[in-house]
Amino acid sequence: MASPTKPGTIEAPPAINSLSATQWTRPDYQLPVPSLQFLFHLECDMEDFHHIGQGPFGNRSTVIFKGGRFEGPRMRGTILPGGGDWEIVQDHDDIQTAHLNTRYNLQTHDGAIIYIQTTGTRTGKRSVLEKLGEDKSITPDQFRMRLNLTLESGDPRYSWVNDGVFIASSGRSGTQVIYDAYQVL
């Protein structure tokens, strides 16, 4: 198994030379390696945890967001109350994976509303993840939480978010979700 890429770096694809030229139509076609541009830092306050229980896809919970804040070079503002996370948790031996699915609204400092939806996973040792809501000493390097973000706005000042590709590195501390979002360029 290959070693993981060092955090903060992007691994370029290897040259295609393991197969004969007849198996590839364009082995010389060089695609650009994407880069990341910081979008914002976000801290979301959670409340009202509803444990629905074990269902056909895993252990489902709903978490309601009461608000929060975000700030970056191109936008800043607050998280409006009422959004939430509809997550499914699955246990595999001593590893736990939460499949995250959030929806909420951001309000920018200049009055625009941006709808945001995230999907992703939070995975790590079950003994660590089961303490996330209670133990603030757990650090982001003890588990992995990554998100894919979709942003939408009808405000012309933020129409650029409608066509963007966004990802985030995330974590949890007590009743907060914290993440740094990036635009993939």
Regions found by a protein language model. Name each.
Residues 2-185:
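Beta-strand-enriched cores of mature, soluble protein domains
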